[in-house]
UniProtKB/Swiss-Prot annotation:
This protein binds to the 23S rRNA, and is important in its secondary structure. It is located near the subunit interface in the base of the L7/L12 stalk, and near the tRNA binding site of the peptidyltransferase center. Keywords: Ribonucleoprotein, Ribosomal protein, RNA-binding, rRNA-binding. Part of the 50S ribosomal subunit. The gene is rplF. GO terms for cellular component: cytosolic large ribosomal subunit. One of its GO terms (molecular function) is structural constituent of ribosome. The keyword Protease does not apply. It holds the Pfam family Ribosomal_L6. This is Large ribosomal subunit protein uL6.
């Protein structure tokens, strides 16, 4: 039995939740997010909370209700506070510069890498070796950060590459003669 689904989602002041069948739209200070919830989940909205209930007689509906509750909670947090993911560029000559809707990356290739910033995401570069990805959609923020990291993953011998700020890179010892 999913314990996650039993906890209600608190709707803070300034957040508007709209239910249209199985589609949930949440609006807040950081923007608006929308998601279609699985048919195995029943949504109940009170004045200041949202509940996800498992439908009776549907296989794995409790698991689906727990998943839906976690996703909706992330949407509420996203439209109120937002999410961010920090990346570091480690290596000689590795640089990042945000220009409008593009992120220019110099990662040791023979050409600069231009990364197109998707809608709903803002990218800051506090220094030339730091990239901060911000947005309301947790999944999109993580995906954009993973796409940037994929251009040059940290290598295990010197640790050069693009890494998350909280990532520990396992180092290998060089081959001995």
């Amino acid at each position: 039995m999913s314990r996650v689904a039993k906890a209600p989602i608190e709707i803070p002041a300034g957040v508007e939740v709209t239910l249209n069948g199985q589609e949930v739209t949440i609006k807040g200070a950081q923007g608006s997010l929308s998601r279609v919830v699985n048919d195995a989940v029943e949504l109940v909205k009170d004045e200041s909370e949202l509940r996800t209930n498992a439908r009776e007689g549907v296989a794995n509906s409790t698991a689906q209700a727990g998943t839906a509750r976690a996703l909706l909670q992330n949407m509420v947090v996203g439209v109120t506070k937002g999410f961010e993911r920090k990346l570091q560029l480690i290596g000689v000559g590795y640089r990042a510069q945000a220009q409008g809707k593009k992120l220019n990356l110099t990662l040791g290739f023979s050409h600069p890498v231009e990364f197109e910033i998707p809608e709903g995401i803002t990218i800051d570069t506090p220094t030339q070796t730091e990239v901060v990805v911000k947005g309301a959609d947790k999944q999109l923020v993580g995906q954009v950060a993973a796409n940037i990291r994929a251009y040059r993953k940290p290598e295990p011998y010197k640790g050069k590459g693009v890494r998350y700020a909280d990532e520990q890179v396992r180092r290998k010892e060089a081959k001995k003669k």
